Amino acid sequence: DFLRKQVQMNKEYIEQLHSKNSSKRTNGDKVFRLWDVVILNPPAFAKSQKELKHALRSYKDLNLHAMKLVVDGGFLITSCSSRHVGFDQFLNMLEAAAADAGKLLRMVNYRGAGEDYPHLIGVNIGNELKFAVFEVRSRKSAASVLQQRKKEEAYK
């Protein structure tokens, strides 16, 4: 309700899509629609250390499909709430997903748990929340942008 009121006040167009199956929005590599912003808030796939490998694969697949749904220059907002997935593993998984999707990611913001969520030293509690905002570019367009910047630098 809050979101709807904000959208109406700002006269913005926002469409929400809730899906437990990201393949409903793609048919293999064919994407049916591109979005300016895609937000992922998946459940904790790794409830135990034993489930970590499968969980990382699931997070990778989900993020890979999401990256394909973002317009070039749009944003992917993604998160992970599994305490068994560390920050480095989270970023490595996203890097692998981006490579497989043919995308480049530019991290705009990263957050962990808020101040009201305690981090207990010596116990793996409190560091499970990972949240990141990325600008998503196709590898081809990113190369073009870099080439243009080099030309602009040469004229200075």
Task: Name every feature range the model reports, one short phrase each.
Residues 70-72:
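Helix-to-beta-strand junctions that scaffold the AdoMet/dcAdoMet cofactor pocket
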Residues 1, 44, 82:
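Active-site-proximal loop/turn and secondary-structure-junction residues that shape catalytic pockets
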Residues 5, 48-50, 87-89:
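Active-site-proximal flexible loops/turns
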Residues 19-26, 35-65:
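Mobile active-site "lid"/loop adjacent to the S-adenosyl-L-methionine
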Residues 23, 34, 61, 75-156:
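C-terminal catalytic and target-recognition region of SAM-dependent MTase-like enzymes
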Residues 3-7, 36-39, 56, 60-67, ...:
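Generic hydrophobic alpha-helical scaffold/packing signal
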Residues 1-39:
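S-adenosyl-L-methionine
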